[in-house]
Structure formats: C-alpha cells, structure tokens
Amino acid sequence: MRIRYFAWIKDITNKDDDIIDINHPKTIQELKKYLENLYPELKKHFLQDVLRFAVNQEYVSENLNLQPIDEIAIFPPVSGG
C-alpha cells in the first residue's frame, strides 16, 4: 500500500510517500494510528480532524477497508490566496 503526502505534511514526514504492509492498518482510522507512531507530530492534526484522505483518487470515510493495492493520499486543508 502506498501512502502519499502533500504540502506541509511532507515537511513532517520528510518524504513524499511511504510503502507499508497491508496486514496493518486495515482502515483509514487504523492508518491514522499507524502513522501517529511513525510521525508523532501528525497526531495533533488527526485530532483536529483537518486532514483529508483519498483512496485511489476518491475521498473516503475512516471506516473504509483498505486493500494491498490501494494508494492513499493525505491532504491538508486548502488555503486560498
């Protein structure tokens, strides 16, 4: 499973993406917990519920079951200019 990061999330992770094993996590909610362990600074953003998740280019709920071939993108809030 590929996890893609955008905007300031890349600054937190210091990378554009991660490849992880499907055995854990199985839902977006579990993915958030998994990523909190890898990148503790993300926890406050998850708690504020400001990040959006897309699976295979479609926005999804936290209860979606993930598959090994899924590509998950994590987006911060959009800011205008």
Please state what every model-predicted region is.
Residues 1-79:
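Ubiquitin-like/PB1-type beta-grasp interaction modules and other compact soluble beta-rich domains
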